[in-house]
Amino acid sequence: MKLNIAYPVNGSQKKINIEDKNKVRCFMEKRIGQEVEATTLGDEFKGYVFKITGGNDTEGFPMMQGVGAPTRVRLLLDGRSGCFKPSRDGERKRKSVRGCIVAEDIASLQLIIVKKGDAEIPGLTDVSFPASKGPKRASNIRKLFKLSKDEDVRSFVIRRELPATDKRKAKSKAPKIQRLVTPTTVARRKALRAKKAARHTKASNEAAEYAKLVAQRQQAKAKRSVKVSSKKVVAK
């Protein structure tokens, strides 16, 4: 069985191939989301606790959370179910998936280190891969650096260094800050609100003038009809 182990603290991951089936007995009959002590895998894993996040069987069918079966089943899936990506809105399709219970015909398991053990695992816990990109949203940048709402977040954006190549010089890139509130955006929103209010006032004034004109026309029409009727009475 292949174990894809990830260590989110350091941002590292490693694939380990276990040939002895007796060593992976600790994962049998376990479900996705359960935590398992990995002492039986070897002395280097003593004290480690893994969390099962997924897996695939020998033919590549993925395990699906919420399917309480140790075998393969066929389900009608949509875009919200997982294990299926629709090509258009509302599309559904019947596909084969594995249950969330680990069985002997599982070929690979995805694991996350929840608790670190006594010894270091070479290539996994002794190395660190920092995130290459920082947050883009203004609120997330404030949360990362513990900034107040009055402080400007533009000077705290994490820049990414790009090495020099044959076609370009060394430079740095920064992401465009999303949902950034500046005096320019505040003035723009204020101008839009004022424009909308002026448009509403103009429309209401024009509607009042039109109603007044219609009332005058109706009064004039009523007077003309009264005069015509009086002339007819006199003629008789």
From Swiss-Prot:
GO terms for biological process: mitotic cytokinesis; ribosomal small subunit biogenesis; sorocarp development; translation. GO terms for molecular function: structural constituent of ribosome. Keywords: Cytoplasm, Nucleus, Phosphoprotein, Ribonucleoprotein, Ribosomal protein. The keyword Nucleus applies. SMART domains: Ribosomal_S6e. Ribosomal protein S6 is the major substrate of protein kinases in eukaryote ribosomes. InterPro entries: Ribosomal_eS6 (IPR001377), Ribosomal_eS6-like (IPR014401), Ribosomal_eS6_CS (IPR018282). One of its GO terms (cellular component) is ribosome. It is found in: Cytoplasm; Nucleus, Nucleolus. The keyword Phosphoprotein applies. Component of the 40S small ribosomal subunit. Plays an important role in controlling cell growth and proliferation through the selective translation of particular classes of mRNA. Part of the small subunit (SSU) processome, first precursor of the small eukaryotic ribosomal subunit. PANTHER family: 40S RIBOSOMAL PROTEIN S6 (PTHR11502). Belongs to the eukaryotic ribosomal protein eS6 family. Component of the small ribosomal subunit. Part of the small subunit (SSU) processome, composed of more than 70 proteins and the RNA chaperone small nucleolar RNA (snoRNA) U3. This is Small ribosomal subunit protein eS6. It comes from Dictyostelium discoideum (Social amoeba).
